[in-house]
């Protein structure tokens, strides 16, 4: 690899993308600086010289955000970046997933790919720059990576597909798709959509793949110019004689154990075979390396037999047909004090989702490398160890939990009613109670049930299903509603969520080089059939959202005030609004256009707060009559409170019909009197009269008396 700085450029969606090599991070196995517009990402790849003594490929991908990239200084006392943001974690997963399948089986050297975001142009995706940079850093290095790969974001505006849409274009788009792959096939999909038909999603994926091919050709030119020769690495292999001996000892019994339909009984049967074989070699005092190889051989026996049964005999581990969905059971309203709850069970996978409604002030503020914005819909996913019958420390959410939560959020967001139609913040929490595959999709189904139970007026119910694939040469079998073993030992995990009308979210991960259009098309159509079946089941439990909210959910009333009056409601340093909140216990959120949201569990307090605000913003008109309380008495007259925050003066000459010597002779502080507005001067001061009303009353009485006399 040349140590001189070299620069390569290509046009990407009308903006220049530049790759620089040979100047930065030269001690890494591979390093590139990718500039896309004003976005700049440094991507590096390093690998250990020796293989690690582990039974998996130790790859770590880190997408590192630096706030200097957008000219910000971190908040807090420490003033430096802390733990990765949710966006950074999701970006790390996005890069990891298409890269991981492109390392050889048996490769055990530790590999770390790090992308540091150094400058951000909001219209030029730093995630896509990091994905390209990660692929290039590996490809030009001596690490035996079988890439390159590339990624592209695809939007659709007015029926036209757009590559790498700008922020403004994303707001208009009904598809938000990230697709990645090699020049020959697609190996990763992540998408959100607004109930888009399967055929359109497939076209969007293939449209993105056309751009991927162009970006890979660009990378191949760079590799040709500056790439290092790949290292010769010894791949992990088991001893041939040991392999034959273990297979003779275990294969027959393992084949029988695999065909036990119930998950735990099947696992017990498989573990019993493993235990017998391991104990045999332990009795022969086999060393740790030999025992490790024995475990590897036993794993391969299980994998090969499961795949053979599915592709050749068309038998799944639990006895189902390829397109068969496990038994479904659902229930709503099982938690009395929550605002809404839904329990969704599919075979041995179970999720309990809880919906909580809050005021608009409860929105989540997102402040990272992107434009600062708020989020009024949230979905969080928890995967406790008891869901798989295991024990482990209870810690915060990991990458997988954050990823599954984000997938559920993306699937449900298109059907959430607008703020205008439903002025609430909505938070969903999905607790996985049992796991045997497809828990993320169960959480989507449970969340739909919970929101319908809570009375959220969804545009349409959403269900999710996980599709699998087992491929052997040109032969393949697509599986609906995969369970844990099929996910673990198969070639694909393709999650599809949506309504009866179309797709709202996709996520695809594969363990092989890639998938053809034909397989993707078949998987999407089979997923649609399964999704509609699940939706019909859910609607048999609750046909439509409840018309009334829970008694324990906040009641929200909306009112509109003159925007010029907002400062009056807030008051100096928030004094006025805090007084209202303290007096009524409500939450108040005010938009710049003068829309006011008042929320509380107590409707009476909502009404009280509304009345106070109405009084504050009310405009006094000449001729209006008020019943007010005397707040202050002066020699020249009395000050009367017409309503909260608005006083007027009754001059001494306007207190009574007769001449008044002292104000106190007529009124005192605390008296409630009826007054009429007779003038509002240029300074906005309100002049009142009691005398005018007394005179009007006197004239009415005189007229009545006159009428009575005429009748006599």
From Swiss-Prot:
Pfam families: KH_1 (PF00013), PNPase (PF03726), RNase_PH (PF01138), RNase_PH_C (PF03725), S1 (PF00575). Its EC number is 2.7.7.8. It catalyses: RNA(n+1) + phosphate = RNA(n) + a ribonucleoside 5'-diphosphate. Its cofactor is Mg(2+). SMART domains: KH (SM00322), S1 (SM00316). Coiled coil: none annotated. It is an enzyme of class 2 (transferase). InterPro entries: ExoRNase_PH_dom1, ExoRNase_PH_dom2, ExoRNase_PH_dom2_sf, KH_dom, KH_dom_type_1, KH_dom_type_1_sf, NA-bd_OB-fold, PNPase. Mg(2+) binds at residues 487, 493. It is found in: Cytoplasm. It comes from the Bacteria. GO terms for molecular function: 3'-5'-RNA exonuclease activity; magnesium ion binding; polyribonucleotide nucleotidyltransferase activity; RNA binding. Residues 623-691 form the S1 motif domain. Keywords: Cytoplasm, Magnesium, Metal-binding, Nucleotidyltransferase, RNA-binding, Transferase. One of its GO terms (cellular component) is cytosol. Residues 554-613 form the KH domain. PROSITE patterns: KH_TYPE_1, S1. Involved in mRNA degradation. Catalyzes the phosphorolysis of single-stranded polyribonucleotides processively in the 3'- to 5'-direction. Belongs to the polyribonucleotide nucleotidyltransferase family. This is Polyribonucleotide nucleotidyltransferase. It comes from Bacillus cereus (strain G9842).
């Amino acid at each position: 690899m040349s140590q001189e700085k070299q620069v390569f450029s290509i046009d990407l969606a009308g903006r220049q993308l530049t790759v620089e090599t040979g100047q930065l991070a030269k001690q890494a196995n591979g390093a590139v600086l990718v500039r896309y517009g004003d976005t700049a990402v440094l991507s590096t790849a390093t690998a250990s010289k020796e293989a690690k003594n582990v039974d998996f490929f130790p790859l770590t991908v880190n997408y590192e955000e630096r706030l200097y990239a957008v000219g910000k200084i971190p908040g807090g006392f420490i003033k430096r970046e802390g733990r990765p943001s949710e966006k950074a974690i999701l970006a790390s997963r996005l890069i990891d997933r298409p890269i991981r399948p492109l390392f050889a089986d048996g490769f055990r050297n530790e590999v770390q790919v790090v992308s540091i975001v150094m400058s951000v142009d909001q219209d030029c995706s730093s995630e896509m720059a990091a994905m390209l940079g990660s692929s290039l850093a590996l490809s030009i290095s001596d690490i035996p990576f079988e890439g390159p790969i590339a990624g592209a974001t695809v939007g659709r505006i007015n029926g036209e597909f757009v590559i790498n849409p700008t922020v403004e274009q994303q707001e208009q788009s009904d598809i938000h798709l990230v697709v990645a792959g090699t020049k020959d096939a697609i190996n990763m999909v992540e998408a959100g959509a607004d109930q888009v038909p399967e055929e359109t999603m497939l076209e969007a994926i293939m449209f993105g793949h056309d751009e991927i091919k162009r970006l890979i050709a660009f990378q191949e030119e760079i590799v040709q110019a500056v790439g290092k020769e790949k290292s010769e690495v010894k791949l992990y292999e088991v001893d041939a004689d040991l392999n034959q001996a273990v297979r003779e000892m275990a294969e027959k019994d393992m084949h029988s154990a695999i065909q036990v339909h119930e998950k735990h009984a099947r696992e017990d049967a498989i573990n019993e075979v493993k235990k017998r074989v391991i104990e045999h070699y332990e009795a022969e005092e086999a060393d740790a390396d030999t025992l490790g190889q024995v475990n590897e051989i036993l794993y391969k026996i299980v994998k090969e037999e499961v795949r053979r049964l599915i592709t050749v005999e068309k038998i799944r581990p639990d006895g189902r047909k390829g397109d068969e969905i496990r038994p479904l059971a659902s229930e709503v309203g099982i938690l009395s004090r929550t605002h809404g709850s839904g329990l969704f069970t599919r075979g041995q996978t179970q999720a309990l989702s809880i919906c909580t409604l809050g005021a608009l002030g409860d929105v989540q503020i997102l402040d990272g490398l992107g434009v600062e914005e708020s989020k009024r819909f949230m979905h969080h996913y928890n995967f406790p160890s008891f869901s798989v019958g295991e024990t482990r420390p209870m810690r915060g959410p990991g990458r997988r939990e954050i990823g599954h939560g984000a997938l559920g959020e993306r699937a449900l967001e298109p059907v959430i009613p607008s703020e205008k139609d439903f002025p609430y913040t909505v938070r969903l929490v999905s607790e996985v109670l049992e796991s045997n595959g497809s828990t993320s999709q169960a959480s989507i189904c449970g969340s739909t049930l919970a929101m319908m139970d809570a009375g959220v007026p969804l545009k349409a119910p959403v269900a999710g299903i996980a599709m699998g694939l087992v491929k052997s040469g040109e032969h393949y079998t697509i599986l609906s509603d995969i369970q844990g073993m099929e996910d673990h030992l198969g070639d694909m995990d393709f999650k599809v969520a949506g309504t009866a009308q179309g797709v709202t979210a996709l996520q695809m991960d594969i363990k092989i080089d890639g998938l053809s259009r034909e397989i993707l098309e078949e998987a999407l159509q089979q997923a649609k059939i399964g999704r509609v079946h699940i939706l019909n089941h859910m609607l048999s439990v609750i046909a439509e959202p409840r018309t009334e909210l829970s008694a324990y959910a906040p009641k929200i009333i909306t009112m509109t005030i003159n925007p010029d009056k907002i400062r009056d409601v807030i008051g100096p340093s928030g004094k006025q609004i805090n007084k209202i909140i303290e007096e009524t216990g409500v939450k108040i959120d005010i938009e710049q256009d003068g829309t006011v949201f008042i929320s509380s569990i107590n409707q009476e307090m909502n009404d009280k707060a509304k009345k106070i605000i109405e009084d504050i913003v009310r405009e006094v008109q000449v001729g209006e009559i008020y019943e007010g309380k005397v707040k202050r008495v002066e020699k020249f007259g009395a000050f009367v409170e017409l309503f909260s925050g608005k006083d007027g003066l009754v001059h001494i000459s306007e207190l009574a019909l007769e001449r008044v010597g002292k104000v106190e002779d007529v009124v005192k502080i605390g008296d409630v009197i009826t007054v009429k507005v007779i003038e509002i001067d240029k300074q906005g001061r309100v002049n009142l009269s009691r005398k005018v009303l007394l005179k009007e009353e006197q004239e009415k009485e005189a007229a009545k008396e006159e009428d009575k006399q005429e009748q006599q």
